[in-house]
């Protein structure tokens, strides 16, 4: 069982808190009973790592791929996915983690 934390691209609830800003609270509230998927604002590999570090089990996003598809078709999507993957790998190396399971809230700095 899982729940999706989303603001629907900001077009439904434009005044609500961003999914990431409330992610840790939601993860704490549901505990191990429900997996939490973060959706909304996921446009870079580092966004995925931040969400996973905050406790999400997965991330979802569509704009990144849709923009690439509209701009350059299948080649654009393939390049976008490759860049996304490279961003995740590079950020993990910079953070000193070898596995996603090593991510945790202690690696996040909230403003």
Predicted regions and their residues:
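Glycine/Thr-rich beta-alpha phosphate-binding loop at enzyme active sites
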Residues: 1-26, 30, 71
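Alpha/beta catalytic cores of nucleotide-metabolism and tRNA/nucleoside-modifying enzymes
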Residues: 21-111
């Amino acid at each position: 069982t899982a729940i999706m934390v989303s603001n629907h691209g900001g077009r439904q609830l434009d005044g609500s808190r961003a999914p990431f800003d409330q992610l840790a609270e939601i993860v704490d509230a549901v505990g191990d009973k429900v997996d939490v998927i973060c959706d909304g604002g996921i446009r870079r590999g580092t966004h995925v790592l931040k969400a996973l570090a905050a406790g999400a089990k997965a991330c979802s996003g569509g704009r990144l791929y849709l923009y690439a598809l509209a701009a350059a078709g299948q080649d654009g999507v393939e390049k976008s996915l490759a860049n996304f993957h490279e961003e995740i790998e590079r950020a993990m190396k910079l953070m000193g983690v070898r596995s996603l399971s090593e991510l945790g809230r202690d690696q996040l700095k909230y403003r």
